[in-house]
Amino acid sequence: MSAGRKIVVVDGGLSTQLESMGCDIDGPLWTARALQENPTAIEAAHRAFISAGADVIITGSYQVSRQGFIEAGHAADDADRALGLSVEIARRAAEGTSTVVAASVGPYGAISHDGREYKGNYGLSERQLADFHRERIEFLVAAAPDMLAIETIPDVREAEALAVALEDFAGFPAWITFAAKDEGHVCAGQTIEEAVAVAQSIPGIERVGINCTAPVHVNGLIDRITAATSLPVIVYPNAGGTWDSLSGHWLGVTHEDIVRCAREWRDHGATWIGGCCGTEAEGIGAISEALRAA
């Protein structure tokens, strides 16, 4: 139980919010496309989450990397600029508020735009993965976010590589969240306890948890995480619906469903709570209102 603990509301799915605003983010760069083509929309999306009650916003850098930009036909320095710009935009949106700006560090598989971020097992060495993440983190940290959001990590081996990469950043504050396939395992198959053990070894990690995961698994995952660590727990799972590509909306999810789940996650011990794919600003508003009223 988290009785007496302060609940912090994390924002929702940036891509979901952008799509709800009519933005076209299809293609290999996903939300990174909007960083280049429509930065004002990114800022508006951040502002929408803040207005809805989010205490923490996550930058649009999830899918930004030199490798990904080069493969999409852009220059490497375009990626470097986009990383810094993602933090700058979030800072502008949060100006005049106490909102925490967390710079997104997505998994290696996100550059493929084919779902590999939910599988892991990339066939790369620890050094290759560490180098990939280090060059991104360098530009994000230089832009001075409040912390890093290392998110949607599907494989303990990638977390181990991130531990190596983060040694160069003197314990810069961060959280790490894993993508899970059931109540006990991350997507690549290792146990959540193995993932937590690695998380605790990473310099600067202040909280650990779950994101981009079906909500049905989250209560059990929180229970196992809290049994394995004293680190605070953060969860921002998917909304749990089905994406309808024709309508451009998530189907089968109500705000009542989202609120019910958020209350359960709080009661199981999570203290930072938000949403991921399928949760737009209106859903975060419902979570914020419900958790602050309880």
Task: State each model region's role.
Residues 1-294:
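Domain-level signal for soluble alpha/beta catalytic cores
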